[in-house]
Amino acid sequence: RITLSNKNHPGMIGKITTVLADNKLNIIDMVNKSRGDIAYNVIDLETKPPEKVLVELTALDDVISVREV
């Protein structure tokens, strides 16, 4: 499971899921909630993400934090 917080801008879910797809990670479940300018995502993956995926997600513009739980 990955949790992310990001600025609530159009296209952010697409950017996040593209990183996961490019790294051959399958999303089992995903929840996206927003409050004002901030969005919070909980993404359940089929397999544990490699560290490089967390780094790639963190490097995306408008991502505030990324955590594996």
Short names for language-model regions:
Residues R1-V69:
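A conserved regulatory-domain signal marking ACT and ACT-like small-molecule sensing domains
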